[in-house]
Amino acid sequence: HSDGSGVAISSRLRPIFNMRPKYRHWLSPSLWQLNADLHLTDWLEEKNFDFDVVTDEDLHLEGVELLNRYKCVLTGSHPEYSSEKMLAAYEQYQLNGGRWIYLGSDGFYWISEYHPDNPNIIEVRKGEAGTRAWTANPGEYNNAFDGKYGGMWRARGRIPSKVCGLTFTAYGFDVSSYYKRSPDSKRPECSWIFDGVGEDEVIGDFGLVGGGAAGLELDRYDLEFGTPHNAYLLARSENHTNLMMQVNEEIHFTVRGYYGGGTENPMVRADMIYYKTPNDGALFAPGSLSFCGSLSYNNYNNNVSKILKTQLEDF
């Protein structure tokens, strides 16, 4: 607002000029959100996959019944804002045996509540913690629409790693990096994912978003925070710059030299994971916001494209 306070309530009916193809966001070295998601739909068309596009509002209103129509569900690059009904649908879909591919980072992070009578209106409170552009004033952390505590889902006991196996760990808006395969990728349960990819091959050192498949915002594998113990760590990013910083909700003290950037902080990384879920379901997630920007490199003939195509064909 003009007085400097944050906007907690908004509507999709108002013009949103940065939600259009080819818009370059001021934070990103390339594309962001909707226009970055078009990298994925372009790739799906190029590889002749049949697909439907559904919105967050569709999922909120229809729930898991919507997802149950599909053997495999993919997210876009930045599914940051989720309602309680959306999280419940994602979780139930996995329990039902659905195959889920989480292709973003910083997912399922902020509590988002639709107006009970008008789904065109949504409320998001930026609470006392989180990587955020503004902070609600004291006493204004609870939602007006349902009275429940707002802010981060982890504050309500639903940290993203319990939904998608990964948790938001770092962000930086300069250049993107690449992955190196981890020992789990060579196990019989996982090696098929890397058909056509060498054991020592660098993965994703190219792309339209920052020049690499691991960038902008990153998620990590963390058993302490709820990553399933049956999850396989397939690959891990490396060589991030010192402008890639750990998320501030995990910075306990602002002590000089204690928390560093990408060259010295082990929490600054993207982790690629795969695991089985009940009823013959499974989940794959590369843990990076810029991942889909690498799919079209070299006329779609590259190791990022190969990995996702192999995974999707199996699912």
Question: What are the roles of these predicted feature ranges?
Answer:
Residues 118-306, 310, 314:
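Glycine-rich, aromatic-lined ligand/substrate-binding cores of catalytic
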Residues 1-67, 309:
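Aromatic-Pro/Gly-enriched surface loop or interdomain linker
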Residues 36, 65, 80-86, 266, ...:
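Short, glycine/acidic-rich beta->alpha junctions
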Residues 58-61, 78-82, 106-110, 116, ...:
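Solvent-exposed loop/turn segments at secondary-structure junctions
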Residues 23-33, 71-81, 295-298:
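The substrate-binding groove and active-site-proximal loops of carbohydrate-active enzymes
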Residues 67-115, 311-314:
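Short alpha-beta junction capping motif
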Residues 54, 75-76, 103-104, 236, ...:
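Generic beta-strand/beta-sheet core signal
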Residues 46-52, 68-72, 95-100, 228-230, ...:
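Loop/turn elements at helix/coil->beta-strand transitions in domains of secreted/extracellular proteins
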